[in-house]
Amino acid sequence: IPNGLDISRAAPLLCAGITTYSPLRTWNVGPGTRVGVIGLGGLGHMAVKLAVGLGANVTILSRSKNKETDALELGAHRLLDTSDTEAMQHALNGFDVILDTVPVRHDINPYIPLLDIDGTLVVVGQLGLLEEQFTVPMIMGRRRIAGSMIGGIAETQEMLNFCARQNILPDCEMIRMDQINEAFERLERSDVRYRFVIDMSTL
């Protein structure tokens, strides 16, 4: 871990950080790339910070308009309300890469037409079956659905060095060992911004 990175906040970089950094690098995200991020949780908030750090134009895609303040505070340039039919229509062909960080089964069909020609939607959050896919938008726009997991040791080190240079760290809440059960209950309520870190000195 590079000097200058807060150890307590660096821990989630080895999971959420590399999980989102790897696809951003694989799909050549850089200055001017139009990136959408579905989901604003542990993975999503890191995707925003890293994509902004790489120079991308970043939009959070969410059904919850009330997440807009959080999205902007994390560095996103805007929030697209995916429940707004007119807003979704205006966003067609508007993204080069979309990172889907949602961890539960959901319909990704509405997001495919948001990709520009040769655009890619990368699934990093959901393990399991996808909903049935309507293939016309993929065929007509040469759009792709891909998946990505974590990176190797070299890419993880690259990510850590990048975060140290850009001063990028996850938003964390430190908890004691005796708070673990409470933390699990809060996770079930989505009551965490955005990662818990256990203080092992409290063992």
Each language-model region and where it sits:
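Short glycine-/small-residue-rich Rossmann-like dinucleotide-binding loops
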Residues: V102-P103, G125-Q126, T202
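Helix-to-beta-strand junctions that scaffold the AdoMet/dcAdoMet cofactor pocket
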Residues: L115-D116
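Rossmann-fold dehydrogenase core element
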Residues: T120-V122, Q133-E173
